[in-house]
């Protein structure tokens, strides 16, 4: 068993922020995009335990201890999601 750091970082360092920024106009937009998807994933897991399936589950393979935000970032990085602005998002900041 080797000791030390894992060569492939998990969490916010993987995927790198520079790769994620290719899929959003700004860091703010990326944060909102990922947070919304993470809430959907979290709702999916909650509904899965209750036998309801109203949200789409993770689009990438995940591990049981992985956080919904990390899953959302990986989905964004792999190009599986497309950001679209709703009415509330389009009017924000005006």
Swiss-Prot record:
Entry keyword set: DNA-directed RNA polymerase, Nucleotidyltransferase, Transcription, Transferase
Superkingdom of the source species: Bacteria
GO terms under biological process: DNA-templated transcription
Gene Ontology molecular function, alphabetical: DNA binding; DNA-directed RNA polymerase activity
SUPFAM superfamilies attached to this UniProt entry: RPB6/omega subunit-like
UniProt EC number: 2.7.7.6
Transmembrane segments: none
UniProt GO cellular component terms: DNA-directed RNA polymerase complex
Catalytic activities: RNA(n) + a ribonucleoside 5'-triphosphate = RNA(n+1) + diphosphate
SMART domains (UniProt xref): RNA_pol_Rpb6
Top-level EC class as recorded in UniProt: transferase
Purpose: Promotes RNA polymerase assembly. Latches the N- and C-terminal regions of the beta' subunit thereby facilitating its interaction with the beta and alpha subunits.
Family: Belongs to the RNA polymerase subunit omega family.
Subunit structure: The RNAP catalytic core consists of 2 alpha, 1 beta, 1 beta' and 1 omega subunit. When a sigma factor is associated with the core the holoenzyme is formed, which can initiate transcription.
Protein name: DNA-directed RNA polymerase subunit omega
Highest classification ranks of the organism: Bacteria, Bacillati, Actinomycetota, Actinomycetes, Bifidobacteriales
